[in-house]
Amino acid sequence: MASDSSFPGASSNVAEYSVSEISGALKRTVEDTFGHVRVRGEISGYRGPHSSGHAYFALKDDRARLEAVIWRGSMSRLRFRPEEGMEVIATGKLTTYPGSSKYQIVIEQMEPAGAGALMALLEERKQRLAAEGLFDPALKQLLPFMPRVIGVVTSPTGAVIRDIIHRISDRYPLRVIVWPVRVQGDTCGPEVATAVNGFNTLPDDGPIPRPDVLIVARGGGSLEDLWGFNDEIVVRAVAASHIPVISAVGHETDWTLIDLAADMRAPTPTGAAEMAVPVKADLQASLASQSARLSSAMSRFFDQKRQAHRAAARAMPSADQLLALPRRRFDEAASRLTRALFVNTQKKRVHFDGHARQLSPRLLQRRLVELERGVTMLGQRLPRALEAFLRERRTAFTHRANRLSPEPILRRTRLTGSTLEQLDRRRDQAVRLLIERVKRRSQELDRLMRTLSYESVLERGFAVVFDAQGKPVKQAAAVLPGDALSVRFRDGDVGVVARAGLTIPDPTKGQ
């Protein structure tokens, strides 16, 4: 018994509890004492909602840490999306978990710890995304001048979508496709990013046409209301969009990160509609003005061409002038040909008369008498020999007489006359061919003149460069940096300024 008395309080009246009892007592004490509390702290260990919709994380400061949980119902009512490292004010009740002797706060409401905390988080995110190049002006795309389809990412109800559709209908009616999203709350950012990515994945020839420009719009609100448009996934989706994006979030004084990533920022949703489409009446007026100017320019152009044609026609010699020299040469050739034919005919006639005199019958008769006399003399001495010889000579004479007949000469004379007639016909044909050849040459010269004119060269896509005095520039070495030049195309002149002089290519390049 003495040994039992050595334990202090062993026989005292201190109540004894089991572990479950003391844990339950602590739970009731904590919940009764701290029924509703407001706790300021920094979110730590936040990984987003669980698959069940609940969120588990901790609130901490520089000296302590408090576990926290938000049930799914409370999570859906939050007006902003919790972020790791965000300083918040949480309203809820403290409770314990007897199974592990831990206590935690069950959060019913939560809000950022003032605008300063959100602004600090916003500035940190802005600098980080800017360092990645998501706000680079080089990534900005030009808006199409006349889009066929416009995609709008906004709430399907409310004044914003009505203002956009009304403004587009007034300016230039076209097809508008609305992708409905929540524009506030925890799911705002993911829904907007999904909508932007969804529009970009639409095929060009699908049942739903792919928009040519996107408008992401929301009305004005507080920093907390617009916080979903500062979400990192929204910024990345807009920066990666292949479709130009117009940001129209809040009023003109409201700025969100989507404004920096978008290709164009509009002060209001109505302003976004005005940026997206032109005014149809203005286009019609501009088209009429351009049409009138084009008609006037064409009239002036044709007038100039007519004047140039008349001037060229006056400068060209007439057909009589072109044919004067060939005609003179032809007349001279014809005159020489006539004289030559006459002289040749006379020569042939004299030659023919000479042959005719040689074939006179009187001379033949005289020669025959002489031969008969000789034959008579010879016949007295050698009758047989003479008779044979006479027969031989008579035969030879007959043969020669036949050869000396005037018929071949007459036939040749007729042939010469036929040749003269052919020459006369050939002369007439040569004159006609010469005239045709001169006519074709004249037409070729006319076509050549039109081809070699510099207006036709301009029509083939070339240009003529003139200096400040209006003189054509023929060499690149004549152009100095800063010289004012005029480049004449087929449809007008363009003034330019030379940025550099003659550039001599390096012969070593390309080897």
From Swiss-Prot:
The keyword Nuclease applies. The keyword Nuclease applies. Keywords: Cytoplasm, Exonuclease, Hydrolase, Nuclease. Its EC number is 3.1.11.6. InterPro entries: Exonuc_VII_L, Exonuc_VII_lsu_C, OB-fold_nuc-bd_dom. GO terms for cellular component: cytoplasm; exodeoxyribonuclease VII complex. It catalyses: Exonucleolytic cleavage in either 5'- to 3'- or 3'- to 5'-direction to yield nucleoside 5'-phosphates. Signal peptide: none annotated. It comes from the Bacteria. One of its GO terms (molecular function) is exodeoxyribonuclease VII activity. It is found in: Cytoplasm. Its main location: cytoplasm. One of its GO terms (biological process) is DNA catabolic process. PANTHER family: EXODEOXYRIBONUCLEASE 7 LARGE SUBUNIT. Bidirectionally degrades single-stranded DNA into large acid-insoluble oligonucleotides, which are then degraded further into small acid-soluble oligonucleotides. Belongs to the XseA family. Heterooligomer composed of large and small subunits. This is Exodeoxyribonuclease 7 large subunit.
